[in-house]
Amino acid sequence: MFEYGLVYRLVNITFLNDFHDLWNDEEVIKYTAVRENLSLYDTQQRLMNWIGETIFVVLKDNEFIGVVGCPSVNKKNREYGFFYQFKRSEWGKGYASEAAEWVIAYMRRNYGTAVLYADVIPDNIASEKILKHLGFINISKSKANIKGNTVTVKHYKLNIE
């Protein structure tokens, strides 16, 4: 199941420059809610909001390659988001799939029963494929304005036990 030797560490401020680079790559953020051209201060604020959440940096050979996590949506009801973002140089290597499987296993071990929610736009074929492989079910669609374009967003859900 886990074959790439990826290491996971809770998000912390020491990865600020890595996140700044990640979130200023147009290809990486085009499928996300991250706006373009984040300042280092804006990056720091986003990162600080994640401290204490179930969000991990992903390391390969001690180098930052991405992030994966399940931020709380409603802790009382055990509802969490689900996302991952990887440096463009790491796309197509299977790391996103492995990290996604890892964080779901982590949630099972540490939270027991929970519901994970993920959103994807149709152009993000690779991510939608990963969600389906992991057992996420499409529960609805909506329209959203992402960076000035109206797109259909597919909403997925996974019950974990």
Question: Where do the protein language model's features map onto the residues?
Answer:
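Acyl-donor (CoA/ACP) binding surface of acyl/acetyltransferases
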Residues: 1-25, 55-161
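Conserved GNAT-fold acetyl-CoA-binding loop/helix
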Residues: 27-46
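Short loop/turn motifs at secondary-structure junctions and domain boundaries
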Residues: 47-52
